[in-house]
Amino acid sequence: MPAIDCRRLTPVLVVDAIEPVLPFWDKLGATRVIEVPHGAALGFVELRLGAAAVMYQTVASVAADLAAESLGRIGPLPRVTSLFVEVGSLADVEARLAGEPVFQPRRQTFYGSRETGYLDPAGNPVLFAQFLPPPDA
């Protein structure tokens, strides 16, 4: 069976508040593409890093968007969501995120990447990976 015509797949991380996570992504040079208020705060934001995107939405905004029946089916919010981000320079990421909480110190993996993992201010693990050419290449 052929794959569907998928145009984009973007994670939406549900958090209590969006404002605390913005400085984390600002340090990486993310662009705020969409900002939607919910009451006196942000309810939704889409952030872009090059061609990649991540979205954040607040629990309150999700609750307002979904019918109670639908909300009950997805269970309690917020949840932790892990992100894997392939980058061109891990050293650049590490310099920009100096001082942010690290959950995975830099490591070299058997599958050819160097990785360092940080926690965003909402507690979501964000693992940055730089794939290196094989030594014999």
Which role fits each region the language model picked out?
Residues 17-32:
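Amphipathic alpha-helical segments
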Residues 1-12, 28-85, 92-119, 130-137:
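Vicinal oxygen chelate
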